[in-house]
Amino acid sequence: MALEQNQSTDYYYEENEMNGTYDYSQYELICIKEDVREFAKVFLPVFLTIVFVIGLAGNSMVVAIYAYYKKQRTKTDVYILNLAVADLLLLFTLPFWAVNAVHGWVLGKIMCKITSALYTLNFVSGMQFLACISIDRYVAVTKVPSQSGVGKPCWIICFCVWMAAILLSIPQLVFYTVNDNARCIPIFPRYLGTSMKALIQMLEICIGFVVPFLIMGVCYFITARTLMKMPNIKISRPLKVLLTVVIVFIVTQLPYNIVKFCRAIDIIYSLITSCNMSKRMDIAIQVTESIALFHSCLNPILYVFMGASFKNYVMKVAKKYGSWRRQRQSVEEFPFDSEGPTEPTSTFSI
């Protein structure tokens, strides 16, 4: 779901009052959330800017190298390329949410729907491509290596991942809108029961976290066990990489999905019974979802830059860029005394 932290609004605890995905019909007071909004105005722009800059640099390099330099690709390469594209599209939505936290939504209702849908689509597809990578690594270690390379099944899997993410982003296209306070939030119609709203939350948790986490956990566990049984193979580094991947996934994704699960349960059973509890829930969503977004910065490091082959491609790019820079500098070099003898001189650059 598109940045849920931006849904922090004042709401009235009266019967029939609907605000975003929340329905606090048991409340009898007014909860003023100005302090939550002030926290978001400071925290979100800073954190999202850091994520955007780091993630854009890393994932852009991954896409560029796979697109222009690495022509011979494996299935894992295809999944990593799709993961980097998903992360980039996700990152491109972050400036809009940073502005939304400070100034409100200024781009209109249509852009609110599109940006929210893109956010969910790429967040979910990224998690699913992580699961695909774990399956391919499991097959590579435990099965007989295949010489067929990237085949039709690989592209079918990628298509299915994107379609599943698109389907899960449809609620964002339908329900997200700009409210009276100029905030891009989901507003559900009154005829839509609390069970349906909770179901949407649970689907996001299951497809975007639980299923990928279970697949990654099982595949990497079997892969690690297989590596430890292999004779005459140095396994310390592969095991460290696998362990790092799992730990980073848990640390970045588990807190956010726990908070989402608590909120889904609250939608049905109205567990939040005070204004302070509601504020703490809003801040928890802001912080945990921001941490979850940071995973898009770490994906290039975890899945690409740790590989020796990709490092070689990076070195080739660096050498080519260095050679280009040297050639350009040599063209720009000229002696300060144009009539004097030719000799090495200082370069002049802007």
UniProtKB/Swiss-Prot annotation:
<dbReference type="GO" id="GO:0004950">
    <property type="term" value="F:chemokine receptor activity"/>
</dbReference>
<keyword id="KW-0675">Receptor</keyword>
<keyword id="KW-0297">G-protein coupled receptor</keyword>
<dbReference type="InterPro" id="IPR000276">
    <property type="entry name" value="GPCR_Rhodpsn"/>
</dbReference>
<dbReference type="GO" id="GO:0005769">
    <property type="term" value="C:early endosome"/>
</dbReference>
<dbReference type="InterPro" id="IPR017452">
    <property type="entry name" value="GPCR_Rhodpsn_7TM"/>
</dbReference>
<keyword id="KW-0597">Phosphoprotein</keyword>
<feature type="topological domain" description="Cytoplasmic">
    <location>
        <begin position="64"/>
        <end position="87"/>
    </location>
</feature>
<dbReference type="GO" id="GO:0006955">
    <property type="term" value="P:immune response"/>
</dbReference>
<feature type="transmembrane region" description="Helical; Name=6">
    <location>
        <begin position="241"/>
        <end position="261"/>
    </location>
</feature>
<dbReference type="InterPro" id="IPR005383">
    <property type="entry name" value="ACKR4"/>
</dbReference>
<feature type="transmembrane region" description="Helical; Name=7">
    <location>
        <begin position="290"/>
        <end position="310"/>
    </location>
</feature>
<keyword id="KW-0967">Endosome</keyword>
<dbReference type="GO" id="GO:0005044">
    <property type="term" value="F:scavenger receptor activity"/>
</dbReference>
<dbReference type="GO" id="GO:0007204">
    <property type="term" value="P:positive regulation of cytosolic calcium ion concentration"/>
</dbReference>
<feature type="topological domain" description="Cytoplasmic">
    <location>
        <begin position="311"/>
        <end position="350"/>
    </location>
</feature>
<dbReference type="GO" id="GO:0005886">
    <property type="term" value="C:plasma membrane"/>
</dbReference>
<comment type="similarity">
    <text>Belongs to the G-protein coupled receptor 1 family. Atypical chemokine receptor subfamily.</text>
</comment>
<feature type="topological domain" description="Extracellular">
    <location>
        <begin position="1"/>
        <end position="42"/>
    </location>
</feature>
<dbReference type="GO" id="GO:0009897">
    <property type="term" value="C:external side of plasma membrane"/>
</dbReference>
<keyword id="KW-0472">Membrane</keyword>
<feature type="transmembrane region" description="Helical; Name=3">
    <location>
        <begin position="114"/>
        <end position="134"/>
    </location>
</feature>
<dbReference type="GO" id="GO:0055037">
    <property type="term" value="C:recycling endosome"/>
</dbReference>
<feature type="transmembrane region" description="Helical; Name=5">
    <location>
        <begin position="202"/>
        <end position="222"/>
    </location>
</feature>
<feature type="topological domain" description="Extracellular">
    <location>
        <begin position="176"/>
        <end position="201"/>
    </location>
</feature>
<feature type="glycosylation site" description="N-linked (GlcNAc...) asparagine">
    <location>
        <position position="6"/>
    </location>
</feature>
<feature type="disulfide bond">
    <location>
        <begin position="112"/>
        <end position="184"/>
    </location>
</feature>
<dbReference type="GO" id="GO:0007186">
    <property type="term" value="P:G protein-coupled receptor signaling pathway"/>
</dbReference>
<dbReference type="InterPro" id="IPR050119">
    <property type="entry name" value="CCR1-9-like"/>
</dbReference>
<keyword id="KW-1133">Transmembrane helix</keyword>
<dbReference type="GO" id="GO:0006935">
    <property type="term" value="P:chemotaxis"/>
</dbReference>
<dbReference type="InterPro" id="IPR000355">
    <property type="entry name" value="Chemokine_rcpt"/>
</dbReference>
<feature type="topological domain" description="Extracellular">
    <location>
        <begin position="109"/>
        <end position="113"/>
    </location>
</feature>
<keyword id="KW-0812">Transmembrane</keyword>
<feature type="transmembrane region" description="Helical; Name=2">
    <location>
        <begin position="88"/>
        <end position="108"/>
    </location>
</feature>
<feature type="glycosylation site" description="N-linked (GlcNAc...) asparagine">
    <location>
        <position position="19"/>
    </location>
</feature>
<keyword id="KW-0325">Glycoprotein</keyword>
<dbReference type="GO" id="GO:0016493">
    <property type="term" value="F:C-C chemokine receptor activity"/>
</dbReference>
<dbReference type="GO" id="GO:0019957">
    <property type="term" value="F:C-C chemokine binding"/>
</dbReference>
<protein>
    <recommendedName>
        <fullName>Atypical chemokine receptor 4</fullName>
    </recommendedName>
</protein>
<keyword id="KW-1015">Disulfide bond</keyword>
<keyword id="KW-1003">Cell membrane</keyword>
